């Protein structure tokens, strides 16, 4: 149950929303598109995550498996949303 609560709070903090929004990320954040299907979720992550080894590992695995050439235009992370939220939750605390 605690895991479910932490996933929901992480999604709230990360600003998870549907891709249809055109809102620019806040200063110091970047938008990433997460999901394995055509309907990806847009999340805002702090730019500082790019320096974190755990986040870099996620990006490397995605690059190896899928590459970074995606039609979404932004940084696309084709992994399960729950996995992404779990990893970014670890980076928060």
Curated annotation (Swiss-Prot):
Effect of loss of the gene: Reduced rosette weight and area at 22 degrees Celsius but not at 28 degrees Celsius.
Topological category with respect to the lipid bilayer: Peripheral membrane protein
InterPro entries in the record: SAUR_fam
GO BP: auxin-activated signaling pathway; response to light intensity; response to temperature stimulus
Tissue and organ expression note: Higher expression in thermo-responsive cultivars (e.g. cv. Alst-1, cv. Ang-0 and cv. Com-0) than in low thermo-responsive cultivars (e.g. cv. Dja-1, cv. El-0 and cv. Kon).
CC terms in the record's Gene Ontology section: plasma membrane
Family, per entry: Belongs to the ARG7 family.
Further information: Exhibits a high natural sequence polymorphism between cultivars, thus conferring thermo-adaptation to environmental conditions.
Entry-linked PANTHER family: SAUR-LIKE AUXIN-RESPONSIVE PROTEIN FAMILY-RELATED (PTHR31929)
Job description of the protein: Provide a mechanistic link between auxin and plasma membrane H(+)-ATPases (PM H(+)-ATPases, e.g. AHA1 and AHA2), and triggers PM H(+)-ATPases activity by promoting phosphorylation of their C-terminal autoinhibitory domain as a result of PP2C-D subfamily of type 2C phosphatases inhibition, thus leading to the acidification of the apoplast and the facilitation of solutes and water uptake to drive cell expansion. Functions as a positive effectors of cell expansion through modulation of auxin transport. Involved in thermo-responsiveness of plant architecture. Enhances plasma membrane H(+)-ATPase.
Quaternary structure note: Interacts with PP2C-D1.
Name assigned to this protein: Auxin-responsive protein SAUR26
